[in-house]
Amino acid sequence: MKAATAYINTDALTHNIRQLHLQAPNSKLLAVVKANGYGHGLLHVAKSLPDADAFGVARIEEALTLRAGGVVKPILLLEGFYGASDLPVIVTNNIHTVVHSIEQLEALESAELDNQAVVWLKIDTGMHRLGVRPEQLDDVVQRLHACDNVAKPLRYMSHFGCADDLASNVTNQQINTFLSLTEGCRGERSLAASAGILAWPDSQLEWIRPGIIMYGVSPFTEPDRSAEAFNMQPVMTLTSSLIAVRDVKEGEQVGYGGIWTSERDTKVGVIAIGYGDGYPRTAPNGTPVLVNGRIVPMAGRVSMDMLTVDLGPNAQDKVGDEAILWGNGLPAEVVAEHIGTIAYELVTKLTSRVDMTYL
């Protein structure tokens, strides 16, 4: 009997990448594998994506792990380098870098490098998190063009703040701003991440940057914009096993704090997974779990190693039966909505105690 196991379906990953190529047929694809491949395993994911043209990471350590693992395709450091001491490592390992600040520009201008850095200039088009402001752009571009440490031509990118909100007018404003600012630029451009690829086709430029959708999880909350609706398949299925099936009488409480009281005589299943495995302790009563092909509600507080579900009075489930926490048959987005979080958080927060099995 297995405890918490995350099954990673690499065929689904390949399928999803091909669907994204169909969605944006004129764009090259930078597969975002930051945060340990969104919790799916950095190297395993990268090596399962022969159709990706490049990879995106957040930390230089992630890029070096890919290089040490034999990945030779371009790797982009999406947050850029953190200090001047990173620059020799970046150019030695052929890691492309975002530049989003004057401090980074000054570090490039003063560095003594053996090779040039490939730079993606990030423009703040309205999210106001990272990026040079539009009024700074001309000066920054001129200085980067004049810098011997920077490979030419420059590349350009920005990031959406509200692309998952189809009612927002911010995304169209960002698209128009970016297209206007980069008009006439010789370098390649990238604007669309997952939501942009799926809902804002005008943002599909020379490069797209799929993240969460690549793993078969939708960035949207609307049912008609589920991953399945986009013909995407879940890559991760998180499972565990029933380790006990108990008779609980009407009026009896279950678990820490007694936050669930049975309204009838029923059977409660105990599943070997908890917040020690990364399953959120904040999951409330009623959070769905899939047991033997049917949805059953969580009943009681998630503990470190276990959680409990109401199997129903006529349940035939037995010890050893599999429970699916999310994945095939139970989308992570649905679970996240019940918990009050986002699916990104679910898949990236599993702990080392969860066995990763690649299919």
From Swiss-Prot:
EC primary class? isomerase
- Which molecular function terms from Gene Ontology are attached? alanine racemase activity; pyridoxal phosphate binding
Reaction catalysed by this enzyme = L-alanine = D-alanine
**Which residues does substrate bind?**
R129, M304
Sorted UniProt keywords = Isomerase, Pyridoxal phosphate
Pathway listed for it? Amino-acid biosynthesis; D-alanine biosynthesis; D-alanine from L-alanine: step 1/1
Active site annotated at which positions?
K34, Y256
Indicate the transmembrane segments per the record: none
Regarding protein family, the annotation reads:
Belongs to the alanine racemase family.
Stated name of the protein: Alanine racemase
Source species of the chain? Photobacterium profundum (strain SS9)
* Gene name as annotated: alr
